[in-house]
Amino acid sequence: EQCIEDYFGIQIDRYARVNFYSFIDIVETVGGIDMEVSKAEAEGMKKPMAEQNKYLKNKKGTDYISDDIFAGKSDEDKVKLHLNGNQALAFARLRYVGNSDYERTERQRRVISEIITESKKLNLVQLDKLLNKVLPEINTDLTDGEIANLLLNAFDYMKYDIQQLRIPADGYFTNEVIYSMDVLNPDFAANSAFIQYIVYGSCKNIDEAIKQYQEENAYNYSYDTGYYGY
């Protein structure tokens, strides 16, 4: 948290953080989620699910997606499935299918979006039950009063649009190998600006933020590095 605040010039507050296995309970409490899953993803989910089953003391192979579902399909072909908590966690953790960590973070955003979608179907009593179930498993800086206010106004908040932002943004980082490790070296000045434009400013998406940043910093562009200066 402190590292992100220092490097990107933002204040992180009103956050909620859960661990792997609390995440399973959250998905189960909303009744599972619908997700488009490819044949390659279903196969790749088996490795993280094996780790989860061992931790949860489940029988080996529990919740594996049947190969029969994808009979005759290519690795890229997708099927809409209803995932339980164990399966949803494995799907969100999946890294070595597709474009590495980029697709993994995309899957994580898709899963979170679907959890929100399912939560919108709950009535006030069900939402209260959900909170009573998951709040003990969530680490947050929200006060009890703020949580109560969120619950009372939940139906209004659920009508809000959800904005997503991936950092570092395309074109504003370099791929490097440092100490034999693959790392992304971001243009911190640009990416900090993108976050601040969207969180605190008037930009609604990364494209608007990039355009605004380029307009404000055109005089300071380096053709040697491909970066806009500080």
PLM segments and residue spans:
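Solvent-exposed, acidic/flexible segments
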Residues: 1, 16-20, 81-85, 101-109, ...
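Solvent-exposed, polar/charged alpha-helical surfaces in well-ordered, non-transmembrane soluble domains
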Residues: 2-6, 13, 21-28, 90, ...
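Second-shell loop/turn segments in exported
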Residues: 4-14, 77-78, 94-103, 116-121, ...
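Structural recognition of the beta-strand scaffold that forms the well-ordered cores
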Residues: 14-17, 90-91, 163-166
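A mature extracytoplasmic/lumenal domain signature
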Residues: 16-22, 31, 39-41, 169-171
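Flexible, polar/acidic helix-loop-strand segments at domain edges
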Residues: 25-126
